[in-house]
Amino acid sequence: MANHRMSEATNHNHNHHLPYSLIHGLNNNHPSSGFINQDGSSSFDFGELEEAIVLQGVKYRNEEAKPPLLGGGGGATTLEMFPSWPIRTHQTLPTESSKSGGESSDSGSANFSGKAESQQPESPMSSKHHLMLQPHHNNMANSSSTSGLPSTSRTLAPPKPSEDKRKATTSGKQLDAKTLRRLAQNREAARKSRLRKKAYVQQLESSRIKLSQLEQELQRARSQGLFMGGCGPPGPNITSGAAIFDMEYGRWLEDDNRHMSEIRTGLQAHLSDNDLRLIVDGYIAHFDEIFRLKAVAAKADVFHLIIGTWMSPAERCFIWMAGFRPSDLIKILVSQMDLLTEQQLMGIYSLQHSSQQAEEALSQGLEQLQQSLIDTLAASPVIDGMQQMAVALGKISNLEGFIRQADNLRQQTVHQLRRILTVRQAARCFLVIGEYYGRLRALSSLWLSRPRETLMSDETSCQTTTDLQIVQSSRNHFSNF
């Protein structure tokens, strides 16, 4: 009994101060035959055997009560194969299990179990897996915490989108109205553009037809000997610049007829001065257009303008430097205009006098240029004729300057007449000018379109009359016999 009590006391003390080596030796090493007879005594030590059995049972219970490292509830950690799915780890809080009376009362056994658990080594794979899972769980926690804030803000702000939607619907109606109006304007602009394009194409076609008609008339005039040039067919002698000018001049004549009809209608309808002023200003702008066309044509072919093939035959009778004389135009106006004040008459006569002086100066300059050209071409060449022709070409190029100065004089005369006269007098003045040149063109058309049979009948009648006179005179001569 004494030996048994001592063994219990020893067991109690070992529960508190049991060395780790003894426990490790008891767990891993089986008692050998030498252990019973350790002290060399033949008696069997039941106290030591009881102590070993108790410690082995305590270790077994602690291992059963020890929670798993990464999982709870007996489930092992599962690794999901899809990277988008988080790795689920089951962590369980340590729960106190009811232990036996020896474990609940012995604090030493609890310390021993905690020490043994902490001292148990962990496998390398499990530690590596645990380190890889920890940042992943942290990132998931951060993302869930950050995504949780906008979700709450979105749940708190449903009224604001409804207000924005209401505003959008009201502004959408306004935008729809603006869009419809703009679409209507675009359709109208496209329609007008198509009409202008169609009119331009028709105008080009009519100009082409008129150009072909002019070529036919020129060819017929050359065949009849009425064309003064008389140097072959018109095709090779007309340059591209001259042909373009003829086409543009034909278009200008059409616009001139339209402006004349507007002025005539305005005067007959007794329009107001403001409305009539618009018509007169439009005609002046139309009159300036012909001078611009002539300036372009003079650079291309100055002889075409000087000869005046672009004009009607009756107009060519009064041509002066590729146009009309301003002084002759003023004479026509003075004879046709009435109810002019003395101041207006003085201004018109002063304009006529200055125009005549400018015409004489330009005419003298043109005569000097012609004489210089004659002297250059008539002089005998010193070495060869190339230098002589170069000088002659330089003198011919001066013709363009004379044409430009003559057109400036005509343009200034028309603008001065507009300043001297009133609006209605200016409208009447331009109507007289337009009708005068219209009659000249009509006279030329009548003369060119006269039938050939009339000419033949006139020649036949003249020849018959001559023959009759000869016969009658011969009869009278032989009547005495």
UniProtKB/Swiss-Prot annotation:
> In the record, what terms sit under GO molecular function?
DNA-binding transcription factor activity; protein homodimerization activity; transcription cis-regulatory region binding
Main location (coarse class): nucleus
Name the GO cellular-component terms.
Answer: nucleus
Report the coiled-coil segments: none
Q: Where is the composition biased (Polar residues)?
A: 110-126
Expression triggers: Induced by flg22 in leaves.
Q: Which residue intervals make up region (Disordered)? A: 91-181
Tissues where the protein occurs: Mostly expressed in stems, inflorescence apex and flowers, and, to a lower extent, in seedlings, leaves and siliques.
CDD domains noted in UniProt? bZIP_HBP1b-like (cd14708)
Keyword terms, alphabetized: Activator, DNA-binding, Nucleus, Transcription, Transcription regulation
Q: Where is the DOG1 domain?
A: 242-450
Q: Where is the bZIP domain?
A: 176-220
Q: Which cysteines are joined by disulfide bonds?
A: none
Q: Where in or outside the cell?
A: Nucleus
The segments labelled Leucine-zipper in the record are: 204-218
Bias type Low complexity, positions: 97-109, 143-155
By its UniProt entry, which Gene3D superfamilies does this protein fall under?
Answer: 1.20.5.170
- Matching InterPro entries: bZIP, bZIP_sf, TGA_domain
Q: What does this protein do?
A: Together with TGA10, basic leucine-zipper transcription factor required for anther development, probably via the activation of SPL expression in anthers and via the regulation of genes with functions in early and middle tapetal development. Required for signaling responses to pathogen-associated molecular patterns (PAMPs) such as flg22 that involves chloroplastic reactive oxygen species (ROS) production and subsequent expression of H(2)O(2)-responsive genes.
Subunit organization: Homodimer. Binds DNA as a dimer. Interacts with floral glutaredoxins GRXC7/ROXY1 and GRXC8/ROXY2 in the nucleus. Interacts with TGA1, TGA2, TGA3, TGA4, TGA5, TGA6, TGA7, TGA10 and PAN.
Q: Which family does it belong to?
A: Belongs to the bZIP family.
State the name under which the record lists this protein: Transcription factor TGA9
- Provide the species name: Arabidopsis thaliana (Mouse-ear cress)
